[in-house]
Amino acid sequence: MVMKPYVIIFSTVSIDGRLATKTGYSELSCPYDKQRQHEIRSEVDAVMVGANTVRVDNPSLTVKYGKNRRNPIRVVVTRSFNLDPSYKIFTTPPSTVIYTSNYESEKVEEFIRKGVIVRKFLHLDDLLEDLYDNFNVRRLMVEGGGHLIWWFIKDNLYDEIRITISPRIFGNGVSFTQGEGFIGEDSPRLELIDAKICECGNEVHLTYKKYMT
């Protein structure tokens, strides 16, 4: 039996479902939402983002708030390998793993010399199996961006979605899922597990799981 991690998709979006404006502005989270994000990070074994999130936000993906400051493994998924080794995620602890379908890139050896683990992948399900078998990842948090979230949802490789609705309207920009979309009845159904008004009083945090018939 193929074993894979339990996958939690976490995101904060505007009322109209955007992760960022068309210019890349993405400051949506209140301090309480940021703390919630870091607490979830501390409870998982790995946190994953796409390459564009690394290029635009330059995140460290470490745990800064909460009682448990244990940092998860950081995972970056890229097809092009258009990444700079000076980004925070590659120059600070803990370990970072890059999964790429462009393993022949001349940059691979440069990243390996800096201590970054680089793995070749063609399909997300193979990537998840590798994380489970070789990195002991049992719980994985996927933080974006929109293309990566779409791949997970399209391939039905998620277990839970935790989403915070921020009181902003962007009108255009990066959607929660950036992909070709579903057609009618093939779109997945979700079951609402929990709904909370944020401590700030102006945001709502929702937890969904896949609807089980």
UniProtKB/Swiss-Prot annotation:
GO terms for molecular function: 5-amino-6-(5-phosphoribosylamino)uracil reductase activity; NADP binding. Its EC number is 1.1.1.302. InterPro entries: DHFR-like_dom_sf (IPR024072), Rib_reduct_arc (IPR006401), RibD_C (IPR011549), RibDG_C (IPR002734), Riboflavin_Biosynth_HTPR (IPR050765). The keyword NADP applies. NADP(+) binds at T53, D57, R79, S80, F81, N82, L122, G145, G146, H147, L148. It catalyses: 2,5-diamino-6-(1-D-ribitylamino)pyrimidin-4(3H)-one 5'-phosphate + NADP(+) = 2,5-diamino-6-(1-D-ribosylamino)pyrimidin-4(3H)-one 5'-phosphate + NADPH + H(+); 2,5-diamino-6-(1-D-ribitylamino)pyrimidin-4(3H)-one 5'-phosphate + NAD(+) = 2,5-diamino-6-(1-D-ribosylamino)pyrimidin-4(3H)-one 5'-phosphate + NADH + H(+). The keyword Secreted does not apply. Pathway: Cofactor biosynthesis; riboflavin biosynthesis. Keywords: NADP, Oxidoreductase, Riboflavin biosynthesis. One of its GO terms (biological process) is riboflavin biosynthetic process. Catalyzes an early step in riboflavin biosynthesis, the NADPH-dependent reduction of the ribose side chain of 2,5-diamino-6-ribosylamino-4(3H)-pyrimidinone 5'-phosphate, yielding 2,5-diamino-6-ribitylamino-4(3H)-pyrimidinone 5'-phosphate. Belongs to the HTP reductase family. Homodimer. This is 2,5-diamino-6-ribosylamino-4(3H)-pyrimidinone 5'-phosphate reductase.
